[in-house]
From Swiss-Prot, chains A, B:
PANTHER family to which the protein is assigned, alphabetical: PEROXYNITRITE ISOMERASE THAP4, THAP4 PROTEIN
Start-end of Basic and acidic residues biased regions: 1-20
Source organism superkingdom: Bacteria
Reaction catalysis annotation: peroxynitrite = nitrate
Protein name, UniProt field: Peroxynitrite isomerase
Family the entry assigns: Belongs to the nitrobindin family.
Region feature Disordered, mapped onto this chain: 1-21
Pathway linked to the protein: Nitrogen metabolism
Binding-site positions, heme b: 171
Enzyme kind, highest EC tier: isomerase
EC numbers, comma separated: 5.99.-.-
Length: 180, 180
Protein backbone atom coordinates (compact mmCIF):
# COMPACT_ATOMS: atom_id res chain seq x y z
CA UNK A 1 0.00 0.00 0.00
CA UNK A 2 1.54 3.30 -1.00
CA UNK A 3 1.08 6.59 0.75
CA UNK A 4 -0.28 9.79 -0.70
CA UNK A 5 2.37 12.40 0.03
CA UNK A 6 2.07 16.16 0.27
CA UNK A 7 3.20 18.27 -2.63
CA UNK A 8 6.70 19.65 -2.24
CA UNK A 9 6.29 22.92 -0.28
CA UNK A 10 9.14 24.67 -2.14
CA UNK A 11 8.67 23.99 -5.85
CA UNK A 12 11.28 25.42 -8.21
CA UNK A 13 10.63 28.59 -10.19
CA UNK A 14 11.28 28.50 -13.95
CA UNK A 15 10.77 32.18 -14.71
CA UNK A 16 12.23 35.34 -13.15
CA UNK A 17 8.71 36.73 -12.63
CA UNK A 18 7.36 33.55 -10.99
CA UNK A 19 7.45 32.52 -7.31
CA UNK A 20 9.71 32.03 -5.50
CA UNK A 21 11.52 35.35 -6.00
CA UNK A 22 14.99 34.61 -7.40
CA UNK A 23 17.91 35.25 -5.08
CA UNK A 24 19.70 38.57 -5.83
CA UNK A 25 22.91 36.72 -6.74
CA UNK A 26 21.10 35.01 -9.62
CA UNK A 27 20.74 38.35 -11.44
CA UNK A 28 23.55 37.62 -13.99
CA UNK A 29 21.93 34.30 -15.03
CA UNK A 30 18.18 35.02 -14.80
CA UNK A 31 17.96 34.90 -18.58
CA UNK A 32 18.74 31.16 -18.45
CA UNK A 33 15.73 30.29 -16.32
CA UNK A 34 13.26 28.03 -18.12
CA UNK A 35 13.35 25.21 -20.65
CA UNK A 36 15.20 25.24 -23.93
CA UNK A 37 15.09 23.00 -26.97
CA UNK A 38 17.21 22.89 -30.10
CA UNK A 39 19.70 21.16 -32.33
CA UNK A 40 23.41 20.63 -32.17
CA UNK A 41 26.36 19.02 -33.93
CA UNK A 42 29.19 17.15 -32.36
CA UNK A 43 32.36 15.25 -33.17
CA UNK A 44 35.65 14.12 -31.71
CA UNK A 45 38.69 12.36 -33.22
CA UNK A 46 37.97 9.18 -31.24
CA UNK A 47 34.35 9.03 -32.43
CA UNK A 48 33.36 7.57 -35.81
CA UNK A 49 32.27 10.68 -37.66
CA UNK A 50 30.30 13.75 -36.73
CA UNK A 51 26.74 13.54 -35.44
CA UNK A 52 23.59 15.61 -35.16
CA UNK A 53 21.50 15.72 -32.01
CA UNK A 54 18.52 17.38 -30.42
CA UNK A 55 18.69 18.67 -26.86
CA UNK A 56 16.55 19.90 -23.99
CA UNK A 57 18.00 22.09 -21.25
CA UNK A 58 16.24 23.20 -18.08
CA UNK A 59 17.32 25.80 -15.55
CA UNK A 60 15.29 26.40 -12.37
CA UNK A 61 15.82 27.71 -8.85
CA UNK A 62 14.22 27.54 -5.39
CA UNK A 63 15.05 31.01 -4.07
CA UNK A 64 18.60 30.19 -3.08
CA UNK A 65 21.72 31.41 -4.94
CA UNK A 66 22.07 28.45 -7.30
CA UNK A 67 20.40 27.14 -10.45
CA UNK A 68 19.29 23.56 -10.89
CA UNK A 69 20.54 22.42 -14.29
CA UNK A 70 19.53 19.42 -16.38
CA UNK A 71 20.31 18.58 -20.01
CA UNK A 72 19.07 15.68 -22.12
CA UNK A 73 20.10 14.97 -25.71
CA UNK A 74 19.18 12.38 -28.30
CA UNK A 75 20.91 11.52 -31.54
CA UNK A 76 19.21 12.20 -34.87
CA UNK A 77 19.51 10.08 -38.00
CA UNK A 78 20.11 11.38 -41.52
CA UNK A 79 16.38 12.16 -41.81
CA UNK A 80 16.42 14.14 -38.54
CA UNK A 81 14.40 11.45 -36.79
CA UNK A 82 15.28 10.45 -33.21
CA UNK A 83 17.87 7.65 -33.25
CA UNK A 84 18.54 6.96 -29.53
CA UNK A 85 19.01 8.71 -26.18
CA UNK A 86 22.41 10.32 -25.85
CA UNK A 87 24.21 12.67 -23.42
CA UNK A 88 22.55 13.58 -20.12
CA UNK A 89 23.74 15.98 -17.48
CA UNK A 90 22.46 17.31 -14.19
CA UNK A 91 23.87 19.53 -11.50
CA UNK A 92 23.95 22.95 -9.90
CA UNK A 93 25.27 26.38 -10.85
CA UNK A 94 26.29 28.29 -7.72
CA UNK A 95 26.49 32.09 -8.02
CA UNK A 96 29.06 33.81 -5.83
CA UNK A 97 28.87 37.39 -4.46
CA UNK A 98 31.68 38.49 -6.79
CA UNK A 99 29.72 37.23 -9.83
CA UNK A 100 31.73 34.04 -10.25
CA UNK A 101 29.86 30.89 -11.24
CA UNK A 102 30.72 27.45 -9.82
CA UNK A 103 29.01 24.77 -11.89
CA UNK A 104 28.79 21.16 -10.74
CA UNK A 105 27.86 18.95 -13.67
CA UNK A 106 27.59 15.14 -13.63
CA UNK A 107 27.02 12.73 -16.46
CA UNK A 108 25.88 9.10 -16.45
CA UNK A 109 29.11 8.31 -18.31
CA UNK A 110 30.83 8.50 -14.91
CA UNK A 111 32.09 12.08 -14.99
CA UNK A 112 31.57 14.63 -12.20
CA UNK A 113 32.97 17.99 -13.15
CA UNK A 114 33.35 21.22 -11.25
CA UNK A 115 33.67 24.21 -13.54
CA UNK A 116 34.28 27.84 -12.65
CA UNK A 117 33.74 30.98 -14.64
CA UNK A 118 31.76 34.14 -14.90
CA UNK A 119 28.66 35.61 -16.47
CA UNK A 120 29.65 38.65 -18.54
CA UNK A 121 26.78 40.36 -20.28
CA UNK A 122 24.88 37.62 -22.13
CA UNK A 123 27.74 35.13 -22.08
CA UNK A 124 28.77 32.58 -19.47
CA UNK A 125 32.19 31.05 -19.87
CA UNK A 126 33.10 28.02 -17.77
CA UNK A 127 36.31 26.01 -17.55
CA UNK A 128 37.32 22.99 -15.54
CA UNK A 129 38.29 23.43 -11.90
CA UNK A 130 38.31 19.71 -11.07
CA UNK A 131 37.12 16.45 -12.65
CA UNK A 132 36.24 13.32 -10.65
CA UNK A 133 35.86 10.07 -12.55
CA UNK A 134 34.02 6.87 -11.69
CA UNK A 135 36.34 3.82 -11.68
CA UNK A 136 35.03 2.67 -15.08
CA UNK A 137 34.64 6.11 -16.70
CA UNK A 138 36.59 7.20 -19.75
CA UNK A 139 39.44 9.62 -19.05
CA UNK A 140 38.30 13.24 -19.25
CA UNK A 141 40.89 15.88 -18.33
CA UNK A 142 39.13 19.17 -18.92
CA UNK A 143 36.37 20.98 -20.80
CA UNK A 144 35.44 24.53 -21.74
CA UNK A 145 31.90 25.73 -22.17
CA UNK A 146 30.35 28.95 -23.52
CA UNK A 147 26.63 29.68 -23.13
CA UNK A 148 25.38 32.81 -24.90
CA UNK A 149 21.92 34.36 -24.92
CA UNK A 150 21.94 35.84 -28.41
CA UNK A 151 18.45 37.19 -27.62
CA UNK A 152 15.93 36.56 -24.82
CA UNK A 153 14.72 33.37 -26.46
CA UNK A 154 17.86 31.99 -28.13
CA UNK A 155 20.73 30.23 -26.34
CA UNK A 156 23.88 29.04 -28.10
CA UNK A 157 26.25 26.56 -26.54
CA UNK A 158 29.86 25.61 -27.38
CA UNK A 159 31.74 22.85 -25.64
CA UNK A 160 35.42 21.99 -26.06
CA UNK A 161 36.87 18.79 -24.62
CA UNK A 162 40.29 17.43 -23.62
CA UNK A 163 39.86 13.68 -23.15
CA UNK A 164 41.07 10.16 -24.00
CA UNK A 165 44.52 11.42 -24.92
CA UNK A 166 43.31 14.20 -27.23
CA UNK A 167 44.17 17.89 -26.73
CA UNK A 168 41.43 20.44 -25.93
CA UNK A 169 39.32 20.87 -29.07
CA UNK A 170 35.76 21.41 -30.29
CA UNK A 171 33.30 18.72 -29.24
CA UNK A 172 29.74 20.09 -29.35
CA UNK A 173 27.85 23.18 -30.41
CA UNK A 174 24.11 23.80 -30.30
CA UNK A 175 21.47 26.48 -30.83
CA UNK A 176 18.47 26.28 -28.55
CA UNK A 177 15.19 28.17 -28.44
CA UNK A 178 13.14 28.87 -25.34
CA UNK A 179 10.33 26.35 -25.01
CA UNK A 180 6.80 27.77 -24.93
CA UNK B 1 8.42 34.58 -29.63
CA UNK B 2 9.03 31.11 -28.20
CA UNK B 3 8.90 27.85 -30.09
CA UNK B 4 6.69 24.88 -29.38
CA UNK B 5 9.08 21.94 -29.09
CA UNK B 6 8.42 18.25 -29.52
CA UNK B 7 8.02 16.06 -26.47
CA UNK B 8 11.19 14.26 -25.47
CA UNK B 9 11.17 11.02 -27.54
CA UNK B 10 12.80 8.97 -24.74
CA UNK B 11 10.97 9.80 -21.49
CA UNK B 12 12.24 8.10 -18.33
CA UNK B 13 10.47 5.10 -16.86
CA UNK B 14 9.57 5.22 -13.16
CA UNK B 15 8.32 1.64 -12.75
CA UNK B 16 9.88 -1.71 -13.69
CA UNK B 17 6.70 -2.66 -15.62
CA UNK B 18 6.53 0.63 -17.55
CA UNK B 19 8.21 1.54 -20.87
CA UNK B 20 11.04 1.68 -21.61
CA UNK B 21 12.08 -1.82 -20.53
CA UNK B 22 14.75 -1.48 -17.85
CA UNK B 23 18.26 -2.56 -18.84
CA UNK B 24 19.15 -6.05 -17.53
CA UNK B 25 21.95 -4.60 -15.35
CA UNK B 26 19.37 -2.61 -13.38
CA UNK B 27 17.90 -5.80 -11.94
CA UNK B 28 19.52 -5.39 -8.48
CA UNK B 29 18.06 -1.86 -8.08
CA UNK B 30 14.66 -2.11 -9.80
CA UNK B 31 12.97 -1.86 -6.43
CA UNK B 32 14.21 1.73 -6.13
CA UNK B 33 12.43 2.94 -9.26
CA UNK B 34 9.76 5.52 -8.53
CA UNK B 35 9.19 8.38 -6.11
CA UNK B 36 9.57 8.20 -2.35
CA UNK B 37 8.55 10.52 0.45
CA UNK B 38 9.24 10.44 4.14
CA UNK B 39 10.84 11.88 7.26
CA UNK B 40 14.34 11.96 8.58
CA UNK B 41 16.53 13.22 11.42
CA UNK B 42 19.96 14.67 11.16
CA UNK B 43 22.75 16.17 13.18
CA UNK B 44 26.47 16.85 13.19
CA UNK B 45 28.86 18.25 15.83
CA UNK B 46 29.38 21.44 13.82
CA UNK B 47 25.64 22.07 13.49
CA UNK B 48 23.59 23.75 16.22
CA UNK B 49 21.47 20.85 17.40
CA UNK B 50 19.67 18.00 15.68
CA UNK B 51 16.97 18.65 13.09
CA UNK B 52 13.95 16.98 11.54
CA UNK B 53 13.29 17.05 7.82
CA UNK B 54 10.99 15.75 5.11
CA UNK B 55 12.41 14.35 1.89
CA UNK B 56 11.46 13.33 -1.62
CA UNK B 57 13.58 10.89 -3.61
CA UNK B 58 13.11 9.94 -7.25
CA UNK B 59 14.76 7.15 -9.22
CA UNK B 60 14.10 6.73 -12.96
CA UNK B 61 15.81 5.26 -16.00
CA UNK B 62 15.77 5.56 -19.80
CA UNK B 63 16.59 1.98 -20.79
CA UNK B 64 20.33 2.30 -20.26
CA UNK B 65 22.27 0.75 -17.35
CA UNK B 66 22.02 3.71 -14.96
CA UNK B 67 19.42 5.29 -12.70
CA UNK B 68 18.70 9.00 -12.66
CA UNK B 69 18.63 10.07 -9.02
CA UNK B 70 17.25 13.22 -7.41
CA UNK B 71 16.63 14.06 -3.75
CA UNK B 72 15.02 17.15 -2.22
CA UNK B 73 14.62 17.81 1.49
CA UNK B 74 13.08 20.56 3.57
CA UNK B 75 13.48 21.29 7.24
CA UNK B 76 10.52 20.92 9.62
CA UNK B 77 9.82 23.07 12.65
CA UNK B 78 8.80 21.80 16.09
CA UNK B 79 5.20 21.51 14.86
CA UNK B 80 6.27 19.46 11.84
CA UNK B 81 5.50 22.34 9.49
CA UNK B 82 7.86 23.11 6.58
CA UNK B 83 10.54 25.55 7.70
CA UNK B 84 12.71 26.05 4.58
CA UNK B 85 14.25 24.16 1.66
CA UNK B 86 17.26 22.13 2.65
CA UNK B 87 19.56 19.50 1.08
CA UNK B 88 19.25 18.72 -2.63
CA UNK B 89 21.08 16.13 -4.65
CA UNK B 90 21.05 14.88 -8.20
CA UNK B 91 23.12 12.42 -10.17
CA UNK B 92 23.40 9.00 -11.68
CA UNK B 93 23.79 5.45 -10.38
CA UNK B 94 25.70 3.34 -12.89
CA UNK B 95 25.27 -0.44 -12.64
CA UNK B 96 28.28 -2.53 -13.66
CA UNK B 97 28.20 -6.09 -15.10
CA UNK B 98 29.66 -7.48 -11.86
CA UNK B 99 26.84 -5.89 -9.81
CA UNK B 100 28.90 -2.97 -8.54
CA UNK B 101 27.22 0.42 -8.31
CA UNK B 102 29.01 3.66 -9.19
CA UNK B 103 26.97 6.60 -7.91
CA UNK B 104 27.69 10.17 -8.95
CA UNK B 105 25.94 12.57 -6.58
CA UNK B 106 26.21 16.37 -6.63
CA UNK B 107 24.88 18.90 -4.19
CA UNK B 108 24.30 22.66 -4.55
CA UNK B 109 26.60 23.08 -1.54
CA UNK B 110 29.48 22.57 -3.97
CA UNK B 111 30.16 18.87 -3.49
CA UNK B 112 30.46 16.33 -6.32
CA UNK B 113 30.93 12.85 -4.98
CA UNK B 114 31.62 9.55 -6.66
CA UNK B 115 30.64 6.61 -4.53
CA UNK B 116 31.07 2.90 -5.16
CA UNK B 117 29.37 -0.07 -3.65
CA UNK B 118 27.07 -2.94 -4.28
CA UNK B 119 23.46 -3.96 -4.12
CA UNK B 120 23.13 -7.04 -1.91
CA UNK B 121 19.60 -8.37 -1.51
CA UNK B 122 17.50 -5.35 -0.48
CA UNK B 123 20.44 -3.23 0.66
CA UNK B 124 22.73 -0.91 -1.26
CA UNK B 125 25.89 0.18 0.51
CA UNK B 126 27.94 3.02 -0.97
CA UNK B 127 31.19 4.59 0.17
CA UNK B 128 33.29 7.40 -1.20
CA UNK B 129 35.56 6.75 -4.16
CA UNK B 130 36.38 10.42 -4.81
CA UNK B 131 35.10 13.84 -3.75
CA UNK B 132 35.49 17.00 -5.86
CA UNK B 133 34.80 20.33 -4.19
CA UNK B 134 33.87 23.72 -5.61
CA UNK B 135 36.38 26.44 -4.61
CA UNK B 136 33.98 27.84 -1.98
CA UNK B 137 32.54 24.51 -0.75
CA UNK B 138 32.96 23.27 2.80
CA UNK B 139 35.53 20.48 3.22
CA UNK B 140 33.95 17.04 2.86
CA UNK B 141 36.34 14.07 2.97
CA UNK B 142 34.09 11.05 2.73
CA UNK B 143 30.61 9.67 3.30
CA UNK B 144 28.94 6.30 3.72
CA UNK B 145 25.37 5.54 2.66
CA UNK B 146 23.04 2.59 3.18
CA UNK B 147 19.71 2.34 1.32
CA UNK B 148 17.47 -0.57 2.38
CA UNK B 149 14.12 -1.67 0.98
CA UNK B 150 12.56 -3.03 4.15
CA UNK B 151 9.54 -3.95 2.01
CA UNK B 152 8.45 -3.09 -1.54
CA UNK B 153 7.10 0.28 -0.44
CA UNK B 154 9.46 1.29 2.37
CA UNK B 155 13.01 2.62 1.92
CA UNK B 156 15.32 3.45 4.82
CA UNK B 157 18.42 5.57 4.39
CA UNK B 158 21.48 6.07 6.61
CA UNK B 159 24.22 8.52 5.84
CA UNK B 160 27.51 8.92 7.71
CA UNK B 161 29.81 11.87 7.05
CA UNK B 162 33.49 12.76 7.54
CA UNK B 163 33.75 16.51 7.05
CA UNK B 164 34.96 19.88 8.39
CA UNK B 165 37.58 18.23 10.60
CA UNK B 166 35.21 15.68 12.14
CA UNK B 167 35.72 11.89 11.92
CA UNK B 168 33.22 9.69 10.04
CA UNK B 169 29.99 9.61 12.05
CA UNK B 170 26.20 9.56 11.74
CA UNK B 171 24.74 12.52 9.88
CA UNK B 172 21.29 11.61 8.52
CA UNK B 173 18.75 8.81 8.66
CA UNK B 174 15.33 8.68 7.05
CA UNK B 175 12.38 6.37 6.42
CA UNK B 176 10.58 6.89 3.16
CA UNK B 177 7.41 5.44 1.69
CA UNK B 178 6.69 4.91 -1.97
CA UNK B 179 4.58 7.76 -3.31
CA UNK B 180 1.21 6.77 -4.82
Amino acid sequence: MVDPAPEHPYPDGHRPDEAPAPHALLEPVLGLLGSWYGRGEGGYPTLTGDFGYAQELTFSHDGRPFLRYEARAWLLDADDAPLRPSARECGWWRLQPDGRVEALITQPTGIAEIMVGRATGNTIDLSTHEVALAPTAKKVNATRRRYTLTDDDTLTFHHDLEAVGQPMQHHLSARLRRRG
